[in-house]
Amino acid sequence: MSIILNELQKRKLPNLLCDKNGNGITTVSAWTDNMRPFLKELILKEEYGQLPPYIKPEISTSTVNVNFAGKATWEKVEFAFTNEKNSYTVPTQLIIPKGKLNCPFVIYINFGAEVPHRYIPAEEIIDNGFAIFSVNYNDITMDNGDFKHGIAGLFFSGERKGDSAGKIAYWAYMAIHMMDYLKERSEAKESLIGIAGHSRLGKTALLTAALDERFDFVCSNNSGCSGAALSRGCCKGGESLYDIYTRFPFWFAPNYEKYINNPELLPFDQHALLALVAPRMILVGAAYEDRWADNDNQFLACVAASPIWNLYGKKGFISPDKMPEIGDNFNDGDICFHLRSGEHFHSRFDWNVYMQSVKKHFKLI
């Protein structure tokens, strides 16, 4: 038996090609009209929570004079959200390389406000012809159980219901507004636009791309449990649903607690989240020493999601019949996976793998 197939069969994953009534999904229309909306709503209800109502923000921009030795324009873009309860402003930074017509844009949800940042090698990114649109996740809403402040405070009613938005959903909400803004910019209207994030923000990037089909690609770096990694069959040393929910319940909908001791009861697994991105491009990055992020289950999720790309006549995920090893970079399909040496980090190496794979996939080189 195939090595990979054997590993997948052990996990007894819900079948993406079979709907809730037991009918086979054999066409793109059956997927887009029935199964995709069903899974999307299920994942929001049971895992991340429903996104809050749309608010059109007031936007203001200002130019930063220091601009990478003249190689880029650098703007501060502020999003001011107001509703009947309150108002809140989120600062972001947009860096666009000069002289690059229709360059790809990457929305990056970051752990800090500064650019460059240890996770954003900005000059290397613009030298590769990519624009970067960055936001500090704590400037959206704080990474804790406080739902009274930040964007969350505009919607918090005093209690969280079963499908109330967790912090990951709020971070995704902001990223979707950043996409709205880029679509109004002349420099980005005809450009590829992707989203990237690391760890909990890699989870956020995947959710954002799953919900908003305007994203052309998504880079999920070391996103692990409740991101790119399957929840069933958690590998030795990997983070389980119990581990993540008992430490970070505020990331998720309260409904998610039902499954933390029995992930096999989940009516979906994370390959379904990846499948919601089809037929667009997904790039999953893992690090060998980052066992907590469960590299094998991130790899297997890529394999398990691939049949949905095949429905579209796409390549999906292409790899040899083996589990991944250090140095592997499978980027011949629409789903890409690489495993580097090192620890839990968004490195320059990861950025370069993602950028080169995007260039290859979209024939930019």
Regions found by a protein language model. Name each.
Residues V115, Y119, I176-G238, N262:
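Primarily recognizes the serine-hydrolase "nucleophile elbow" in alpha/beta-hydrolase
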Residues R247, E257, C302-I365:
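C-terminal catalytic histidine-bearing segment of alpha/beta-hydrolase fold enzymes
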Residues S220-L273, Q298-P320:
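Mobile cap/lid helix-loop segments that gate and shape the active-site cleft of serine hydrolases
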Residues N86-V90, I96-F105, N128:
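Proline/glycine-enriched tight loop/beta-turn segments at coil->beta junctions
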Residues L101, I107-R185, G224-G227, S231-R232:
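Cap/lid segment of the alpha/beta-hydrolase catalytic domain
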Residues R291-A301, S347:
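Conserved alpha/beta-hydrolase "acid-adjacent" motif
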Residues M1-T89, K359-L364:
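N-terminal targeting or regulatory segments adjacent to alpha/beta-hydrolase or S9 domains
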